[in-house]
Design a protein with these regions (language model features):
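Intrinsically disordered, charged low-complexity linkers and terminal tails
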Residues: 1-98
Length: 98
């Protein structure tokens, strides 16, 4: 894991990443940006659910031009979830599936 400077990422970068996810669809988005589906949390935006780590990693790429690997940063409560909540986004724990 590397030390990522999240201060360059704004709500606009995150919104742009969400738009990219909607435009490409999950499969192509993950293939293009190097992430996978979420396992524990969802970013909730306009009543839709998104993978927080993938969205934040892509937002970082939009903000800095630097691509992050999934292994470069944490996605949980002390990682992507915390950064997105600090930017004012809603994060929800995924519902348990049986």
């Amino acid at each position: 894991m590397i030390k990522v400077a999240w201060d360059s990422v704004t709500r606009d970068h995150v919104s742009r990443a969400i738009g990219e996810y909607d435009r490409l669809g999950p499969e192509q988005f993950f293939a293009q940006h190097g992430f996978g589906p979420t396992t524990t949390y969802d970013l909730v935006w306009n009543k839709r659910r998104y993978p927080p780590k993938a969205i934040l990693g892509t937002a970082y790429e939009f903000a800095t031009g630097k691509r992050l690997d999934s292994a470069d940063f944490e996605g949980g409560k002390s990682g992507a979830v915390k950064v997105l909540e600090n930017l004012g986004f809603t994060i929800r724990k995924k519902a348990a599936t049986s």
